[in-house]
Amino acid sequence: MALQSVLVTDTNIWIDLENGGILTEVFGLPYQFLTPDFAIRELVRPKWQLLQALGLQSQELEPALIQELTHLRAANRALSATDLAAFLIARALDATLLTGDWRLNDLAAKNGLRVHGVLWLLDEMVRFRAIAPEHAANALNQMLSQGARLPQDEYRKRLAGWST
């Protein structure tokens, strides 16, 4: 059974959301947000304590998955242990993976996981009226000005649609 209301996140997503000024608003979505317990020490901006207070939950890897993480890490050196832990948790829960890392996105897609990024999350925030379209456009512009690397065609399409 797929846990479609559960989103397993990497750390990049939270940085983009903070840069966009919409960290609080994302928790207005009807999703449960999980991140690997490995990520706690990486979440210094935004701080783990803030994210936890807003609703982000940490998820431990099952012991059997820790061994698999070691093998995955050897085969995917460009990905961090935290990124691979997010992948393994999403796969184990049959949940959706949210990532800002194209390498992790590729790995997830090749393994049949549902995977999305911050643009999808912005779409969901507009769809569920957690933010207005104009607010989404402003947040996206802030993310881009802070160095977010997003598919140009995709973000331009959204900016055009949300700014009208």
Predicted regions and their residues:
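Active-site-proximal, substrate-binding regions of enzyme catalytic domains
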Residues: 2-95, 102, 113, 140, ...
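Short, ordered loop/turn segments at secondary-structure junctions
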Residues: 102-103, 120
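Glycine/proline-rich loop-helix segments at beta-alpha junctions forming the active-site rim
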Residues: 107
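A short alpha->loop->secondary-structure connector
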Residues: 110-116
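Hydrophobic alpha-helical interaction segments
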Residues: 117, 121-163
